[in-house]
Amino acid sequence: MIQSITSQGLVLYNRNFREDDKLVKIFTEQVGKRMFFVKHAGQSKLAPVIQPLVLARFLLRINDDGLSYIEDYHEVMTFPKINSDLFVMAYATYVAALADASLQDNQQDAPLFAFLQKTLELMEAGLDYQVLTNIFEIQILTRFGISLNFNECVFCHRVGQAFDFSFKYGTCLCPEHYHEDERRCHLNPNIPYLLNQFQAIDFETLETISLKPGIKQELRQFMDQLYEEYVGIHLKSKKFIDSLADWGQLLKEEKK
């Protein structure tokens, strides 16, 4: 079945196909992720809008049994501030790849599309891209079938405690029940507290957010542990972020 639709869409990536053609993967609001064929991409009027992290309203010809086609576009947003900063662009690319990994092709998920779009808009507006990424990561876990409780102790259900996380139980322990898991994570109690807050944050009302560098580093390390344990995906974009962290540390040392 072939149908023409108009939909908001975010370009996830493109790759070469034959000599001058490209396959372009777009996450659309209406019909989910689709692969689109662009013939003679280098000379095509579509060339400006088939680059990664371009958001536009596309006129699309959708083919449920094969490749789809881009017929036209308007209302283009290119996120210039994101693209002008290597670090921000790396994190933006990662959250887009994470959304891609969490959703099957051809499956509509308008709430996820809106969440990804708002994340990129907040990065473009200058909010802390590392913290925005952590919030995106913790909220998108449900798309991988993972639900974690950072609000209460698994044994006594008390709230507002200096919680630690236990991979043995897959949830939090209060100080009175730390002994239940000798291999608990020994986290800074601020980490479970922040993740509990992050799970409830609504990006539509978020205006500012700021955390100290040390806390952000601890968050990053624990999020990596969570994803390794529960999700098990290894995205190239995440590996690039890790390499940038090493590079950034080298730059700091050279400036001393």
Curated annotation (Swiss-Prot):
SUPFAM superfamilies: ArfGap/RecO-like zinc finger, Nucleic acid-binding proteins. One of its GO terms (cellular component) is bacterial nucleoid. The keyword DNA repair applies. Disulfide bonds: none annotated. It comes from the Bacteria. InterPro entries: ARFGAP/RecO, DNA_rep/recomb_RecO_N, NA-bd_OB-fold, RecO, RecO_C. Disruption phenotype: Mutant is sensitive to the alkylating agent methyl methanesulfonate and the DNA cross-linking agent mitomycin C. Keywords: DNA damage, DNA recombination, DNA repair. Pfam families: RecO_C (PF02565), RecO_N (PF11967). One of its GO terms (biological process) is DNA recombination. Belongs to the RecO family. Involved in DNA repair and RecF pathway recombination. Plays no role in chromosomal or plasmid transformation but is required for resolution of chromosome dimers occurring as intermediates in the formation of merodiploids by transformation. This is DNA repair protein RecO.
